[in-house]
Amino acid sequence: MNIRERKRKHLEACLEGEVAYQKTTTGLEGFRLRYQALAGLALGEVDLTTPFLGKTLKAPFLIGAMTGGEENGERINLALAEAAEALGVGMMLGSGRILLERPEALRSFRVRKVAPKALLIANLGLAQLRRYGRDDLLRLVEALEADALAFHVNPLQEAVQRGDTDFRGLVERLAELLPLPFPVMVKEVGHGLSREAALALRDLPLAAVDVAGAGGTSWARVEEWVRFGEVRHPELCEIGIPTARAILEVREVLPHLPLVASGGVYTGTDGAKALALGADLLAVARPLLRPALEGAERVAAWIGDYLEELRTALFAIGAKNPKEARGRVERV
């Protein structure tokens, strides 16, 4: 199966298949925001503005990486980018590996024309560093007119796919390439970063990490849908670090590094919990896929509702901004 066909099948699985975790949850349900009835705060005072990767976002929100390089990629990415521009939030692009292999795929990623001011983050698998070097990374970011580059690390997904399954020496390889002339972050894809993973990254000059915990989309389930047309190994596909635990573990090891929480953080209230646990930003991907097929307005409406819920949740706990949410949570 070529890479373009695989991307098409990924979209199909995410739209039609049962690719969410079936048993594993984000763990956010195990925490309760500490409500404050006398915080002395006005809702209008709650300011979601958040600096990230050299830009100032109007809210601590990123559109998660989804696609590019297949037939619907351009349509989806343009809708997502238009919404990001309108709302002042950031956007992660889908994996750019296909661009390095097939430069003609650039059209489906080229969104800067509709998002001239938005934060755009290019994306490449960490495992691709076995075949690509510094010049390739510079070329990728330049072609996409991106502001930053995220390396995704996804060993379970690759193993189920029977893709790039040799992850030896990749942290050392990344260390050789850094620093680059733009911010670099590392992210999982939905199975979570652990304390041990954070320790492995601790000495690198990274600009951020995205814990991408378990509880939302299981990319192992996606790959089984693509490979078999069904999920044959459901227990295997439940492996991962729940999002809440991933936030706590990574924040303990990396106390000052900007931390993105994704992985089933699908409501503004859960977003507030993630911020309270130690995240700086939130990212959402799959729930925006179908709205993106319907257009930028639908994407903007979904995100707008999310951010209004987030703002209200912060108000309810007496937090004037995302930073003030830190610690305003308790275990149930």
Swiss-Prot record:
Residues at which FMN binds: 65-67, 95, 123, 187, 217, 264-266, 285-286
Principal subcellular localisation of the protein: cytoplasm
Entry similarity comment: Belongs to the IPP isomerase type 2 family.
Protein name: Isopentenyl-diphosphate delta-isomerase
GO MF term (any one): NADPH binding
A GO cellular component annotation in the UniProt record: cytoplasm
Name of one Pfam family that matches: FMN_dh
Reactions accelerated catalytically: isopentenyl diphosphate = dimethylallyl diphosphate
Gene: fni
